Structure formats: C-alpha cells, structure tokens
C-alpha cells in the first residue's frame, strides 16, 4: 500500500466511526419521551425499574430528577414500545452504514 491508499483508508475509517457516533446520538435522543408530567429515557434501566415496582401508583425520578407520580404499567408499556421502535430503526440504519464501508 502506498501513502495515498493509507490516507484514503484512514479517512474512510474515521468517517465510519464518526457516522456510527452520530447515529448513536441520534437514536439516544429519540429514546426520550414525556409521560405524566415527566421526561423519561426509554431503555433497559427504566424498563427493569418499572418491572420491579408493585402495581398501582408509584413515585419515580424522571430525567431531571423531579419526582413524578406514575402508573408503572403504562410507563413501562410506553418505554418498551419506544425502546423497540428506536432500536429496530437504529439496527436498520447501522446495517446500511456497515454495507457502505
């Protein structure tokens, strides 16, 4: 490999890493949603917390550490739906990005 090929390869690698980072930031931002007067981030942590909370009303801290009274079943359903939708979309875009390399 000559120097020009190495430079092209390193630029392509850098562009791919940057594109993956941007893709991650894009979908992490899409995981945020509002419910019951609070802001929540859909993800395994929230889903697991909600799975362990007993049925009925509960008070949880939202993203801004504000106590919010929620119905755990509703919030868990919304979080799981948002998580699955965004993870599926992220996977599709990630696979498209990987084929462009």
Tell where the protein language model's regions lie, with residue ranges.
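A preference for well-ordered globular domain cores
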Residues: 1-101
């Amino acid at each position: 490999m000559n120097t020009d090929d190495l430079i092209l390869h390193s630029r392509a690698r850098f562009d791919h890493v940057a594109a993956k980072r941007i893709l991650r930031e894009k979908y992490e931002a899409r995981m945020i949603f509002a419910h019951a007067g609070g802001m929540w981030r859909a993800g395994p942590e929230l889903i697991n917390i909600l799975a362990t909370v007993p049925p009925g009303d509960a008070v949880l801290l939202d993203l801004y550490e504000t106590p919010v009274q929620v119905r755990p079943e509703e919030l868990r359903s919304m979080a799981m739906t948002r998580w699955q939708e965004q993870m599926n979309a992220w996977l599709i875009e990630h696979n498209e990005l990987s084929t462009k390399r």
